[in-house]
A protein has these predicted regions:
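Catalytic phosphate/metal-binding cores of nucleic-acid and nucleotide-processing enzymes, i.e., regions
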Residues: 1-121
Length: 121
């Protein structure tokens, strides 16, 4: 395995292990080729793409995340970036980048869940 792939695998595994604390079904996804669906599986209706590179190509990576969100037919896409100098022991300090549209969708889902809960009370 190339050094670049090793770095990617290390970062993806760190994110999956961290998210498993909340979502037990989370796992690192294997490569899917042209129809990739993100690096992390198991978060309902969400694609997570993980990047661990020295230079940041956020615009390019966001386009990749969006393509993978569409491939997965998911509502949400999240790009997770390991900042330079922040190791896997501090994965909770890594960056999650989303579009404003994704934030709006999250708010809509929260409001919908809140209304559903209110109707049950």
């Amino acid at each position: 395995m190339s050094k670049s792939k090793q770095k990617g695998t290390l970062a993806e595994t760190a994110v999956a292990d961290y998210l498993k604390q909340t979502f037990s079904a989370v796992e690192r996804r294997t490569l899917s080729g042209a129809y990739d669906k993100g690096d992390i599986a198991g978060v309902p209706n969400c694609v997570i793409e993980v990047k661990n590179q020295r230079s940041y190509k956020i615009h390019e990576w966001m386009k990749e995340t969006e393509t993978e969100r569409v491939n997965a037919a998911a509502n949400l896409g999240v790009l997770v970036i390991k900042p330079n100098g922040v190791g896997v022991a501090n994965v909770d300090k890594w960056w999650a980048v989303v579009s404003l549209e994704t934030i709006r969708k999250l708010i809509e889902e929260l409001e919908s869940a809140k209304r559903l809960q209110s109707s049950r009370d």
